[in-house]
A protein has these predicted regions:
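Low-acidity, Ser/Thr- and Arg-rich intrinsically disordered low-complexity segments
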Residues: 2-4, 10
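Active-site-adjacent structural elements in enzyme catalytic cores
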Residues: 13-172
Length: 172
């Protein structure tokens, strides 16, 4: 995957645009850059563009989960097809009921214990939602990252389709 700009290994970055659009790197470990980085990330998501954002496990490529074009761009950036739909990051447990239906009590107990954190749950997607994540077979993979910057961004943008910032088959 080609990217414009350079990455730093030591600090989370928001946003980092992949492809030929533009390269903007904000070091969100520097408090003077957080507001600018968040503003740029929100704007990029609003335009249907991809960003690279920190999560609690790896950097992720993220897109508006409700924008079919943005989700297709995310899947293409990963070198995948819609046969492998991306998980969706959420800002809080309350979003579980907004995006899923018929959530088993066992899943509710798991998210109560392990969210925020590196737990992804696959649950029945709410049938009334107007989104296209790919071949989900009526399910959605949801995760609430344990990263303050990610959660702040998710609170402002809403759910984001997100996958690790690497090509499929390559290390993150």
């Amino acid at each position: 995957m080609k990217s414009s700009g350079t990455a730093t290994q030591s600090a989370p970055c928001l946003p980092r645009y992949y492809g030929e659009v533009m390269g903007v790197l904000s070091d969100c470990s520097d408090s003077s850059e957080v507001l600018t980085g968040m503003r740029l990330a929100r704007a990029a998501i609003g335009r249907g563009e991809l960003i690279v954002m920190p999560t609690d496990t790896v950097y992720g490529i993220a897109a508006d989960a409700f924008s079919p074009d943005a989700v297709r761009a995310l899947v293409a950036a990963k070198g995948r097809t819609l046969a492998a739909p991306p998980p969706v990051l959420v800002p809080g447990i309350q979003t579980l009921d907004a995006l899923a239906e018929n959530v088993p009590d066992a899943v509710r107990a798991l998210v109560a214990e392990f969210w925020p954190g590196p737990l992804t749950v696959i649950v029945p997607a709410r049938s009334s939602l107007n989104w296209d994540l790919g071949e989900t077979r009526g399910t959605v993979a949801l995760r609430m990252p344990d990263d303050q910057i990610a959660l702040e961004l998710l609170n402002e943008t809403g759910p984001l389709a997100c996958s690790s910032a690497n090509l499929t088959g390559q290390p993150p």
